[in-house]
Amino acid sequence: MITLLLYLCVICNAIVLIRADSIADPWPEARHLLNTIAKSRDPMKEAAMEPNADEFVGFYVPMDYSPRNEEKNYQSIWQNEITDSQRHIYELLVQSSEQFNNSEATYTLSQIHLWSQYNFPHNMTLAHKYLEKFNDLTHFTNHSAIFDLAVMYATGGCASGNDQTVIPQDSAKALLYYQRAAQLGNLKAKQVLAYKYYSGFNVPRNFHKSLVLYRDIAEQLRKSYSRDEWDIVFPYWESYNVRISDFESGLLGKGLNSVPSSTVRKRTTRPDIGSPFIAQVNGVQMTLQIEPMGRFAFNGNDGNINGDEDDEDASERRIIRIYYAALNDYKGTYSQSRNCERAKNLLELTYKEFQPHVDNLDPLQVFYYVRCLQLLGHMYFTGEGSSKPNIHMAEEILTTSLEISRRAQGPIGRACIDLGLINQYITNNISQAISYYMKAMKTQANNGIVEFQLSKLATSFPEEKIGDPFNLMETAYLNGFIPAIYEFAVMIESGMNSKSSVENTAYLFKTFVDKNEAIMAPKLRTAFAALINDRSEVALWAYSQLAEQGYETAQVSAAYLMYQLPYEFEDPPRTTDQRKTLAISYYTRAFKQGNIDAGVVAGDIYFQMQNYSKAMALYQGAALKYSIQAIWNLGYMHEHGLGVNRDFHLAKRYYDQVSEHDHRFYLASKLSVLKLHLKSWLTWITREKVNYWKPSSPLNPNEDTQHSKTSWYKQLTKILQRMRHKEDSDKAAEDSHKHRTVVQNGANHRGDDQEEASEILGFQMEDLVTMGCILGIFLLSILMSTLAARRGWNVRFNGAQLNANGNRQQEQQQQQQAQGPPGWDFNVQIFAI
């Protein structure tokens, strides 16, 4: 009997194996179908190919987040937007992964859910599931997958979840995965570890380990460049190292930011011809309004440039618009990729059309024509826009531009730099190269490359007495030239400067690594494209990766996507506690890297959470770096006794510092000090029983629900919010502040929310009401004194007799006073409180 059962089992297993063999792995079919569709949409490249691309590209930054709503959106996309072919491909991938344990199909599924590839919806939970399975199948040998998994555990799947996170946040596990990925050669994982040791985040601070890791990455990056790229023409890449909050007046608002804007690649517009600079170039006074940049069409029959202007000033403005149109195509913008071929064609036609008539051009036209020639010569020299460089044409056009510049005092910087490189590396004329470099050293076109080349020449030809190579390289580094950062770091480490420290050397290598955006941070572009494509969760995932790598701009962008401060009378963002905590962490990390505004925002979030001790610590740190908003906030907290004992004298000192650091806030500062005097006087009169201005104070900072006393203006805010929600439907209320609009390359818009003057000046609602009352009293006093003087009343102003029309009028007023009824005597007193 037992033998019979064994035979039956063997037969059944054989049947199963035969059936399994008869069903082939569908991965080849799925891969073939995936190759027939686009992996992702590139809106920047699409804009570059359009003849009339829109220069105002907007995207939405969500304010609210709910895991339940995300799941609803995911299901809705699958039901309404996914096509039958997509469903078929997905089923093939799932079948290959589940039934055949195909590692390639499993990895493809993880990337589909992580990056919304092939137009599938984002799902962090499924991405985590397939990444875990892929690593199990490959025995943790794929460094890219291990790095993705490490970021998931470091961020808790970007802190998703409701009561419990979908992916647990485990810093220790993330650290182990980072170390494993780094051992397998993942440069990004090494960068994460180097940043952790440099900043002391989740690990003990160790500059020696940080230096070793950053130096190792820097050496590999240096080897990735060819000799021509490193020494002659360093590659130009489109940088997306930008904070998305800077498209919306920064983190704190217009006039309050301490950190310069990171948006350096917006569309260039021609300047106002009425500006002093243009008037000086042209030699006459002119007035002309800035107009949007137009496009130029190429006429293939006669090779002419067709503009879209036909007024009397078109000929003069035409060359200006041609230059800026070509410059935008050459450099690219955040919403439009580079189109060097179109820029080169436009400049070649400009050269063909204007060169025969260059003697008839006015100074303004000559100025911009020279810039066109220099850009065209530079493109011939680098080979951009064509298959290979044309050194002969580059030298000819650049020399022509210098000859025209000598006659019309035009710009010479770009031409001198390129001609210096040609003489140094092509014709080997060192003396002529040095001459060109010296002419270009003080020009705006010098980004540090001049000092970089002179430093190398000073080392190779000391007899030329160019200067100290170390000092020249340091100047090139300070100007931001990327190869100079590495060369200067090597000089420092070799002991050329005995005053340098390990921390300083690690910082230099860190700066070089972070600057190599094209290799170390290509996901910056992916994140920005995801925002334009309305995939904010994909953008958040990309920015979170880069934030872990130590990019300050990515830390701010990731935090901004997770939590934004609400406006006055606006509901706070509805999100999870995990996201809010992670946002604070990223803001704090950015603050430690020099972003003062991020520290203020982190303090504001703690302030809203009524954790006043942490808010005070962040404000104090930002105030030490001269943040106007942080100093103001410290005065406010001392005024109301939030996190510290109430101290009007110290609050006054902080308010005075605001006007000392920035005179634009003089009025706001003085009115706040006046309010302090009034409150101090009332407190003394009532023996500290006045609490009209006291904001809410928590009974227990750890409790979510608090029943503390709330100031009247906060109660009014809540009443207005309840009235709005009562009038709106549930859906309308949910969508009422679902998104905040950001417009790229144009004016800043926030939907229907307008930036109030009170926000710019830093006032609270209670401050405005109090100051209004005080101003009302003063205005009433002045009005009464004026009317009394005109009507002949007997008026004393602070004890002084008011006499506007001489002694005779005074005698008449005294007679009228003697005959008039009682009550016509006024004694106006203004007290200095």
UniProtKB/Swiss-Prot annotation:
It is a single-pass membrane protein. Its main location: endoplasmic reticulum. Residues 809-819 have a biased composition (Low complexity). It is found in: Endoplasmic reticulum membrane. Glycans are attached at N101, N123, N142, N429, N611. Keywords: Endoplasmic reticulum, Glycoprotein, Membrane, Repeat, Signal, Transmembrane, Transmembrane helix. Sel1-like repeats lie at residues 103-139, 143-186, 187-222, 413-445, 552-595, 596-627, 628-663. One of its GO terms (biological process) is negative regulation of protein autoubiquitination. Residues 1-20 form the signal peptide. SUPFAM superfamilies: HCP-like. The chain crosses the membrane at residues 768-788. GO terms for cellular component: endoplasmic reticulum; endoplasmic reticulum membrane; Hrd1p ubiquitin ligase complex; Hrd1p ubiquitin ligase ERAD-L complex; Hrd1p ubiquitin ligase ERAD-M complex; luminal surveillance complex. Pfam families: Sel1. Residues 805-824 are annotated as: Disordered. Component of the HRD1 ubiquitin ligase complex which contains the E3 ligase HRD1, its cofactors HRD3, USA1 and DER1, substrate recruiting factor YOS9 and CDC48-binding protein UBX2. Within the complex, interacts directly with HRD1 and YOS9 (via N-terminus). In ERAD-L, HRD3 and YOS9 jointly bind misfolded glycoproteins in the endoplasmic reticulum (ER) lumen. Belongs to the sel-1 family. PANTHER family: ERAD-ASSOCIATED E3 UBIQUITIN-PROTEIN LIGASE COMPONENT HRD3 (PTHR11102:SF160), SEL-1-LIKE PROTEIN (PTHR11102). Component of the endoplasmic reticulum quality control (ERQC) system involved in ubiquitin-dependent degradation of misfolded endoplasmic reticulum proteins. Component of the HRD1 ubiquitin ligase complex, which is part of the ERAD-L and ERAD-M pathways responsible for the rapid degradation of soluble lumenal and membrane proteins with misfolded lumenal domains (ERAD-L), or ER-membrane proteins with misfolded transmembrane domains (ERAD-M). ERAD-L substrates are ubiquitinated through HRD1 in conjunction with the E2 ubiquitin-conjugating enzymes UBC1 and UBC7-CUE1. This is ERAD-associated E3 ubiquitin-protein ligase component HRD3. The gene is HRD3.
